[in-house]
Amino acid sequence: MGTISLAVQLFIVFLLTSYLLNKYSTIRKQNPIVTISTFIGWYFSLIIVFVLPLDVAITFFHKCENDRQRILNTTTSTPAPVVPECELPGGYVPDDVLFNLWRVVYWSAQLLTWLILPLLQSYVTAGNFTILGKIRAAVINNALYYAIYSLCFLAILIYAMFKGVSINIENLKVIVVSASNTWGLFLLVVLLGHGLVELPRSLWHHGNRHYRLRKTYFDIEKLASEKSEAEENVKDIYKKVRVLFNSMKNDSNGQRRKVRTILSKFSDDVIDNLFPSRQVIDNAHLDESGPCSEAKLISLHKKTIYAVQTLNNATAQWKVLVDRALFLENLAFSESNGYNLELSRNTCVPIGVRRFWYTRLQTPFCRILGIVTVFMTFFVLFSECTFFVVSYTLSPAAFVTEYASTRFHYKYTQFVAFGIIVYLITSAYFTIFRLQIYKYYHLDPNGHTDENSILFSAILLCRLTPPICLNFLGMIHMDSHISMAKSFGIETQFTKLMGHLDVIPILAKGINIYLPICIILLCAIHYYRVGAYVLHNIGFDQFVEADEMTNDMINSGRSLVQIERNSIKRSNDRSQRTQNWTNSFGSSNAGNGSTTSKFKRSNKNDEERPMLEDDDEEVEESSTRISMMSPTEHPSSSGFFDDM
């Protein structure tokens, strides 16, 4: 029965991973190897939500059995005392099954994060034209990183030898695992320092529509320059490639075929948007260095891939931000003027339910959820700062887990562990899914994420999987090599797999001191937004309240949204006039001559009506037709918190 329960939980994680991967990427357009590798990385990083609490509950069960057996062996009274039987926790599986599952999860994650995913990342961005050439380029690009990793491992190995550690196969494995997990722990500290603060803050601000609208205006203005720069870059590269292609009409070396491959990276939609007339003005000239070499074509191909990805990301973000601003404006207008918010019917959720959510429930729900996450943040922070104190149980996470096992039943520790690990994972992964690295990494929740970004996210998630488990077990005093607690007696299957982190003394003793200090320091930096103010003062655009530059960008963003609204309105009016003309023309062909003449007079009057008169009437009717001027659906209707 326990195996079936575990299989059901693994299937739930499978469905969740499939949903997230389909939400953030376009599976049909991706390389199948990229999709499969990313899916495995995401799956193994989410599987710990169910497997780790089960491991904790089974460990408490083994502790109960050991205590019961010790009581039976040490008692001398007759008759023997009645010792209650230890009840199996829900979803119990044998230790060897759990141990082998952890082995698959851990080593698969390590193989993906250190070898497969970095090579795939370089492979998809390589400019070579053959598979073998891309593989060679990927190996060369990663050679420097592997050399740095080798030097770090050599330094740790020399340090271990000076400390008297015997160098054998088992200790070498432990040293590699310890170094990898230590790097992952510090990465986890950085992500938690951001996520533990920004997750409650984002939920709180999500309930403030005025703040969200101003922030959206700011983001639109900030993105406008990046989008314009990306468009100009794509234009220049396309002109160069087109000139190069036209100059190779008599090519006999196969170079023209490679240039055609580069041209195929520019989709028809991109060309139509950048060159509406389909006429490329030749402002670029080939270099005077002779015929184009293979290296130049590879470099041009790589630049093309990078430029097109940058433009696609900017265009996708632009559409999402504009749709969000239009929706928030419509929502504010409907509330201030008493009109019902018009929503589309393209979802299975009834319109009345969605309207009630947006107008009545969203704000208080987000505020309450923000308060709950603030409490959980303090809970986690206090646990991080006190988990190494074992003389008294000061860690709230350890106290709650121990209280649930002694006061109620140890099987309830599975639910307590599930709640704590879910918030830890949410805080850390929240940062990964919101992180934006300039023109390199961005996860778009509308399926426009490029292959490089989706692979980089899988690298981060795989690298965080073991450290999150170690950190959680240390918080609840179930990892003696982290919390220095020696009295529990039973270790989890995950700890048995990991080996001893205290083989290298500096890794074992320093982690209890530096990890809490770093988390508190980073949380304070993010709470007071020190980084944002520093970047703002040196010239980078940052959203700072009550700042003149920020207000100017908000006003500029509002103007851009108004331009987009007018463009949508004109497009809708044009489509409506075309539809009316088509319907009238069809009815005139089916009717008599009088109907035809009536249509002509009506059509003539419509065509000859002055444009200013149309504008005046549109202004008068704009307040009652706001739903026709912009999208009538929230831009992320599939998830309420996608635009956090």
Curated annotation (Swiss-Prot):
Glycosylation sites: N73
Entry keyword annotation includes Transmembrane helix: yes
Record's bilayer topology term: Multi-pass membrane protein
Keyword Cell membrane on entry: yes
Top-level lineage group: Eukaryota
Cell compartment(s), UniProt: Cell membrane
Coiled-coil regions, chain positions: 219-242
Protein known as: G-protein coupled receptor-associated protein LMBRD2
Organism: Caenorhabditis elegans
Taxonomic lineage: Eukaryota, Metazoa, Ecdysozoa, Nematoda, Chromadorea
